[in-house]
C-alpha cells in the first residue's frame, strides 16, 4: 500500500446542479445547516494538528459545490499558508468560476478540476439538470486564462447520454494543455440509473480513442488514481479513472473528510468512518484525534481490499455530494 498523504475535504453538501450521477432531482436530501458544517478554523485546526503530523500534506477541496461556501478564498489562502502543506487543489462544477477564478488564483490555488460531461448543451442539461453549459464553458476559459495548470476536466461517462462524445472530448487536448479525465459511472448517488444504464469500461474508451487518434503513455501532475495517456502530438493529456473495472485499491493514497466532520477511509466502503467534529468541539486533545486517525490508517488496507463493494450489492447511505466525491 502507498503512503496515505492525500485528503479530500468536502466544504459543503449543497450544489446548484442536480447531476444524475450525484444528486438527481428526485433524491431526498436533507441539507446540513451551517452550524453542522466544519468551520474554517476547525478545518485548519484538523489539518494543522491532526493530518499534517501524520504525513497527510496534499488536500483537495470538494463539495457539493465548494464555490457556494462563503469566503472560500480566505480558507484557501489560510490553508496554502500552513507550514508543511504541499498541495491544495479544488473540484468545481464551474458555474461560478468566471467570477471567482482570479480570486482563487490570488489566494494561492493553482490546480483545479472542473466537471464537464458534454460538449452538447442539451446533453449537458440532461446530465446536470440545469441549462448552464455556456456559463461552465466560459468558466473553463477564464480558468485557463488566469493560469491554472494543470486544468483538468472531469467526464463521467454514462451509456446512452454522453458515451458517444468520448472522442470529441478527447480532442479538446489536441490544441490545449488540458487534462481530460474519463470516469467510470458508479452506483453512488443514483443506483437506479446505474442499474438501468450500466457503465463503460475505461479500456473500451481507450480502444476507441486509440482507433481514431492513436494513444501513448503520458504524465500529468496530481495525486489521483488516473491512468494517464496522450494523443501523439497533443498538447494535453487524457486520464482514465477505472474504479469499477480496474480496482486500484492497492495504490489508494487518500481519505475523505465530509463537511460535517466524518473521516472516511474508502469511497466504496462505508465501514470504518470516524467523527472528528464532535470530539474536536468537545475539546478532546489533538493527540487523541491523531491517534484515532492513525488507527484508521492502520486498518485502511483491510477496508480497501476486504470490504470493497463494487456496487453489485448493498446500498450507500450517503450520496457523492455528501461524501465529497
Curated annotation (Swiss-Prot):
Ranges where the Radical SAM core domain occurs: 1-226
Binding site for GTP: 8, 60, 91, 152, 254-256
UniProt-listed GO biological process terms: Mo-molybdopterin cofactor biosynthetic process
Binding site for [4Fe-4S] cluster 2: 249, 252, 266
GO MF terms held by the record: 4 iron, 4 sulfur cluster binding; cyclic pyranopterin monophosphate synthase activity; GTP 3',8'-cyclase activity; GTP binding; metal ion binding; S-adenosyl-L-methionine binding
One Pfam assignment: Mob_synth_C
Known catalytic reactions: GTP + AH2 + S-adenosyl-L-methionine = (8S)-3',8-cyclo-7,8-dihydroguanosine 5'-triphosphate + 5'-deoxyadenosine + L-methionine + A + H(+)
Pathway: Cofactor biosynthesis; molybdopterin biosynthesis
SMART domains recorded: Elp3
Enzyme class: lyase
InterPro entries: Aldolase_TIM (IPR013785), Elp3/MiaA/NifB-like_rSAM (IPR006638), MoaA (IPR013483), MoaA_NifB_PqqE_Fe-S-bd_CS (IPR000385), MoaA_twitch (IPR010505), MoCo_biosynth_MoaA/MoaC (IPR050105), rSAM (IPR007197)
Composition-biased stretches (Polar residues): 310-325
Keyword tRNA processing in record: no
CDD domains reported in the protein's UniProt record: Radical_SAM (cd01335), Twitch_MoaA (cd21117)
PROSITE patterns: MOAA_NIFB_PQQE, RADICAL_SAM
Keywords, alphabetical: 4Fe-4S, GTP-binding, Iron, Iron-sulfur, Lyase, Metal-binding, Molybdenum cofactor biosynthesis, Nucleotide-binding, S-adenosyl-L-methionine
Co-factor requirement: [4Fe-4S] cluster
Record flagged with keyword Glycoprotein: no
Cofactor annotation comment: Binds 2 [4Fe-4S] clusters. Binds 1 [4Fe-4S] cluster coordinated with 3 cysteines and an exchangeable S-adenosyl-L-methionine and 1 [4Fe-4S] cluster coordinated with 3 cysteines and the GTP-derived substrate.
EC number: 4.1.99.22
Assigned protein family: Belongs to the radical SAM superfamily. MoaA family.
Function text: Catalyzes the cyclization of GTP to (8S)-3',8-cyclo-7,8-dihydroguanosine 5'-triphosphate.
Subunit structure, as described in the record: Monomer and homodimer.
The protein, known as: GTP 3',8-cyclase
Source organism of this protein record: Synechococcus sp. (strain JA-2-3B'a(2-13))
